[in-house]
Swiss-Prot record:
Region forming the signal peptide: none
Family: Belongs to the ninB family.
Pfam family, any one: NinB
Species: Escherichia phage lambda (Bacteriophage lambda)
Superkingdom to which the source organism belongs: Viruses
Protein name in UniProt: Protein ninB
Length: 146
């Protein structure tokens, strides 16, 4: 069976999803999994994230070091998700155990942007046009954002 995904935005979309499930013939030897979840973050949200991370990476020194955008992403997601660290295999450093932003739901992603905005604003970050648009988007749409 091929994978089906329904984005439910209206009663018509909901009925399409219900109809698709009703067409499945149950087979105890081949169970089918149906998952209902909030949509994951979009490519547009991801672009906005990297604009904000880029601004922070160019303007904020962290404990005497300048971090790249990827490192800042790890710092912010670890703070948001209260992640843990474990020693690396060589025993000469640590690895953050955490969540990938690509698996975040829209609401979680909005929280991440809010955290970055608060952190950057506290430290006087001057937001680029793209980052400013991302933060305005978050303020306007919050958890409902596409």
């Amino acid at each position: 069976m091929k994978k089906l995904t329904f984005e439910i935005r209206s009663p018509a979309h909901q009925q399409n999803a219900i109809h698709a499930v009703q067409q499945i013939l149950p087979d105890p030897t081949k169970p089918i999994v149906v998952t209902i979840q909030e949509r994951n973050r979009s490519l547009d949200q991801n672009r906005k994230l990297w604009a904000c991370l880029g601004d922070v990476s160019r303007q904020v020194e962290w404990h005497g070091r300048w971090l790249d955008a990827e490192s800042w992403k790890c710092v912010f997601t670890a703070a948001l998700k209260q992640q843990d660290v474990v020693p690396n295999l060589a025993g000469n450093g640590f690895v953050v155990i955490g969540q990938s932003t690509s698996r975040m739901r829209v609401g979680e992603f909005a929280e991440l942007l809010e955290l970055i905005q608060a952190f950057g604003t506290e430290r006087g970050v001057k937001w680029s046009d793209e980052a400013r648009l991302a933060l305005e988007w978050k303020a306007r749409w919050g958890d409902r954002a596409a």
